[in-house]
């Protein structure tokens, strides 16, 4: 079996010393973490490794010797390194050396505790793999996508081996917590040996994050307790709360903020990434909301919107009146049932007059309402968009009423015709068994059924025309609201922090590794460079996408068409937990 030695590139120019790392026996791999420089006291090295092993739960040990032949005499150094194997006993004992003045490397693996002196790995069987310790420490290896069963075994084995390498470097972070000003008795070389990589602003933010999170968590817990009060569960408050998109969005953001400012430490990188994505999403949402707020309050745009709202509502009502008058005549040359046509037309015209009166009654207060609604943009653009969606729903409530009236009347006739059609065929619907059974009917039942079927058939075109027109209007309103909800869901669920990491620091999101051959020479160990393969953007979106608000059900095209054909009510006034008709 080939012995694999993972060596950090930051230690390639280190002075001679000891190789400190972890031996992975199941894979015949040695992960080098640091180099201990001369001079040192062996007992102090053992104490340091015991402390690191206790803190990180990683079996760190001295795996061998490192010889960088630049200044030391070769003979004296070689004699000294040979004697270290008796002090720090480990099987296998690695002897890694970089030739003086050249780029040639040599690596041997001996087993001093074995009785057979021939138990030595030739250099051809030792593979030297270089890796970037900083990138490997900061990255997180993701599991592979679902593969066919024939490839699953090999992929799981290789992924498990890489996971051990990544996990060893990540858990050994306590070994790297020293800098060039730390006067320890043991001097190490690793990726932070030249100084700890840190930022003053980051350190200040870490210091202040604890008290700030504790304060905000207390405030959010009070708000959550107030929102969970039993008063909100009483009718009609519970009904209004479940129907308004604004309440759903505020509840969704409250859960996000409670999770972000929770004092509990993230248990794994996935949870930490989720917190970061939520924080960036909230900050972007608030920033966009403040931009919208500044735009609304500049140049008196709220007053302009209020002055334009009433004429627009009057124009919509006027167009609806013209449409109803067209339907009450002979629309497109169709022969309608005049009596039913006049009844339905006057019924809907009366509702339009009521709606116009309601709009004119509210016109003096529209500017004040819009001003207070504009202030809600400081809570985020998603809250402002949700309020805008609710305003559209309220302003088009008469269209919704027309749609409900027409849909219920059309649905009643469809189900009546289907029942009477089963009566002609000697069938009936068995409610208990949910199936159609045979049934015998009397002559009077057949006569009344025939009469009712004829009446419903002749009245169906008039009802269907009104239902078709108001359904198209309702679908137009739903399309506008759907686009608004789509934008809200995009802001809520887009993993902006993960996408930013993938763009700026792709090694942080690792999907795997690739190897590049550095040297392949007879009599020398094969030298490879391990590089991180970043996660693709599609996988980043799939793995880190945040949950949506989910306040409205999502219908498939087949379900939507079936509901439209049979006159059943559709999105958005039905919630997921509601019963179906």
From Swiss-Prot:
Superkingdom as given in the UniProt entry: Eukaryota
A GO term from the CC aspect: glycosylphosphatidylinositol-N-acetylglucosaminyltransferase (GPI-GnT) complex
Presence of keyword Transcription: no
Pfam families assigned to the protein according to its UniProt record, in alphabetical order: Gpi1
Mode of membrane association: Multi-pass membrane protein
Key words, A-Z: GPI-anchor biosynthesis, Membrane, Transmembrane, Transmembrane helix
Keyword Magnesium: no
Residues annotated as signal peptide: none
GO biological process terms, semicolon-separated: GPI anchor biosynthetic process
Location(s) in or outside the cell: Membrane
Alphabetical list of InterPro entries matching this protein: PigQ/GPI1
Pathway linked to the protein: Glycolipid biosynthesis; glycosylphosphatidylinositol-anchor biosynthesis
Transmembrane stretches, start-end: 276-298, 344-366, 381-403, 446-468, 478-500
Biological function: Part of the glycosylphosphatidylinositol-N-acetylglucosaminyltransferase (GPI-GnT) complex that catalyzes the transfer of N-acetylglucosamine from UDP-N-acetylglucosamine to phosphatidylinositol and participates in the first step of GPI biosynthesis.
Family from the record: Belongs to the PIGQ family.
Subunit comment: Component of the glycosylphosphatidylinositol-N-acetylglucosaminyltransferase (GPI-GnT) complex composed at least by PIGA, PIGC, PIGH, PIGP, PIGQ, PIGY and DPM2. Interacts with PIGA, PIGH and PIGC.
Protein name per UniProt: Phosphatidylinositol N-acetylglucosaminyltransferase subunit Q
Native source species: Mus musculus (Mouse)
Gene: Pigq
